[in-house]
From Swiss-Prot:
Of the insulin-like peptides, Ilp2 is the closest homolog of human insulin. Possible ligand of InR/insulin-like receptor. Plays a role in regulating body size by increasing cell size and cell number of individual organs. Probably mediates its growth effects by acting as a ligand for the insulin receptor and transducing a signal via the Chico/PI3K/Akt(PKB) pathway. This is Insulin-like peptide 2. It comes from Drosophila melanogaster. One of its GO terms (cellular component) is extracellular space. The keyword Disulfide bond applies.
Amino acid sequence: MSKPLSFISMVAVILLASSTVKLAQGTLCSEKLNEVLSMVCEEYNPVIPHKRAMPGADSDLDALNPLQFVQEFEEEDNSISEPLRSALFPGSYLGGVLNSLAEVRRRTRQRQGIVERCCKKSCDMKALREYCSVVRN
């Protein structure tokens, strides 16, 4: 009686382990990614379920009156300011080409998120564990 039970439990463990590895080798997006992270991690940073919206019930604004929202948050000064001229490059403006190159450098330096690593491409268990606050034993 114990041999069939141990055989069944061994087969179940092998199937569970192989399905987890198979999920980790493929791409993981949305709910699958959350499920696998909850299996791998004791704690991780879950996706916040609420959407960006108008201010909540604690504000005095009426969500059904869009003009009230615009009037409340519209800037007082609607004038267009002249861009700052550069002293080093008289023909160019600050905020032009030099700042756009800095923006490209900032974007390329940013660490890839879990979506870029595991949803757009396939990732392994080691990559998934990097996103855990506390790894499950």
